[in-house]
UniProtKB/Swiss-Prot annotation:
<dbReference type="Pfam" id="PF00141">
    <property type="entry name" value="peroxidase"/>
</dbReference>
<dbReference type="InterPro" id="IPR002016">
    <property type="entry name" value="Haem_peroxidase"/>
</dbReference>
<dbReference type="InterPro" id="IPR002207">
    <property type="entry name" value="Peroxidase_I"/>
</dbReference>
<feature type="region of interest" description="Disordered">
    <location>
        <begin position="113"/>
        <end position="133"/>
    </location>
</feature>
<feature type="binding site">
    <location>
        <position position="178"/>
    </location>
    <ligand>
        <name>K(+)</name>
    </ligand>
</feature>
<dbReference type="InterPro" id="IPR019794">
    <property type="entry name" value="Peroxidases_AS"/>
</dbReference>
<dbReference type="GO" id="GO:0000302">
    <property type="term" value="P:response to reactive oxygen species"/>
</dbReference>
<feature type="binding site" description="axial binding residue">
    <location>
        <position position="161"/>
    </location>
    <ligand>
        <name>heme b</name>
    </ligand>
</feature>
<dbReference type="InterPro" id="IPR044831">
    <property type="entry name" value="Ccp1-like"/>
</dbReference>
<feature type="transmembrane region" description="Helical">
    <location>
        <begin position="263"/>
        <end position="283"/>
    </location>
</feature>
<feature type="site" description="Transition state stabilizer">
    <location>
        <position position="37"/>
    </location>
</feature>
<keyword id="KW-0408">Iron</keyword>
<keyword id="KW-0560">Oxidoreductase</keyword>
<keyword id="KW-0812">Transmembrane</keyword>
<feature type="active site" description="Proton acceptor">
    <location>
        <position position="41"/>
    </location>
</feature>
<dbReference type="GO" id="GO:0042744">
    <property type="term" value="P:hydrogen peroxide catabolic process"/>
</dbReference>
<dbReference type="GO" id="GO:0034599">
    <property type="term" value="P:cellular response to oxidative stress"/>
</dbReference>
């Protein structure tokens, strides 16, 4: 594993430049779904017991992207390689997770808190750590609990299937989960609760979410309350993107010091208004006394 990057002002500025480039790339290539898939699949190999796998960029190596569950993922890796060359300071691990965050945001999803500083690794985990779409609730829990995630995380993250479609050459399944596979919303859950969503895909792992009573409670909540889904999804996505990763203190210090100019202006304006009100009140009181 390589050394952790130094997350200073220069690194954070590079991250913001990469974020802008990612927005342009995703818009021009309509590749949000596969960018989200890349971020998930790099992170979703984490094992909390052995502290191996996770969002470390190892998916860029053939021994990992050739896993059956990663069929087609090389497309995303290749799309991001020129960007890595433009922003060499940023680690692959950070770039892949940033791509997932941007993919959600530019398609209408929630803003996800992103903290950089991940190390790159060339140590790929053994095959079989990612979810198998042909299995059910017990399998989902086995996979996600191994990562250290919860039932709520399982359902919230499954809502990411609102983006994209399954392809036979990659998974053996064919079709989209929603009517607009390039829009991030809560329609995945709405369709799940319908007995017949004609022309839309429902994998065995999708059906497990409505068949299992604990999972179903979250499905029903997210189907009727998109704000609740967005809130929980953003929280779960952040957890997934930081599995096995301890954000460097320098990143938090930098973020806390970067108060937006608009906010500073609002604060200054607020102080000025408050001062004016106090002065006006003082003058009024003085006039009363003089009268």
């Amino acid at each position: 594993m390589s050394a952790a990057p130094v997350v200073d002002a220069e690194y954070m500025a590079e991250v913001e430049r990469a974020r802008r480039d990612l927005r342009a790339l995703i818009a021009s290539k309509s590749c949000a779904p596969i960018m989200l898939r890349l971020a998930w699949h790099d992170a979703g190999t984490y094992d909390k017991a052995t502290k191996t796998g996770g969002p470390n960029g190892s998916i860029r190596f053939p021994q990992e992207y050739s896993h059956a569950a990663n069929a087609g993922i090389k497309i995303a890796i290749d799309l991001l390689e020129p960007m890595k060359q433009r922003h060499p300071k940023i680690t692959y691990a950070d770039l892949y997770q940033l791509a997932g965050v941007v993919a959600v945001e530019v398609t209408g999803g929630p803003t996800i808190d992103y903290v950089p500083g991940r190390r790159d690794s060339s140590d790929s985990p053994e095959e079989g750590r990612l979810p198998d779409a042909k299995k059910g609730a017990a399998h989902l829990r086995e996979v996600f609990y191994r990562m250290g995630l919860s039932d709520k995380d399982i359902v919230a993250l499954s809502g990411g299937h609102t983006l994209g479609k399954a392809r036979p050459e990659r998974s053996g399944f064919d079709g989209a989960w929603t009517k607009d596979p390039l829009k991030f919303d809560n329609s995945y859950f709405i369709e799940l609760l319908k007995e017949n969503s004609e022309g839309l895909l429902k994998l065995p792992t999708d059906k497990a979410l409505v068949e299992d009573p604990t999972f179903r409670r979250y499905v029903e909540l997210y189907a009727k309350d998109e704000d609740a889904f967005f809130r929980d999804y953003a929280e779960s996505h952040k957890k997934l993107s930081e599995l096995g990763f301890t954000p460097p203190r320098s990143a938090f210090i930098y973020k806390s010091c970067q108060k937006p100019k608009s906010l500073l202006m609002q604060t200054a304006a607020g102080v000025a208004v408050a001062a004016a009100v106090v002065a006006w009140a003082y003058l009024c009181e003085s006039n009363k006394r003089l009268g």
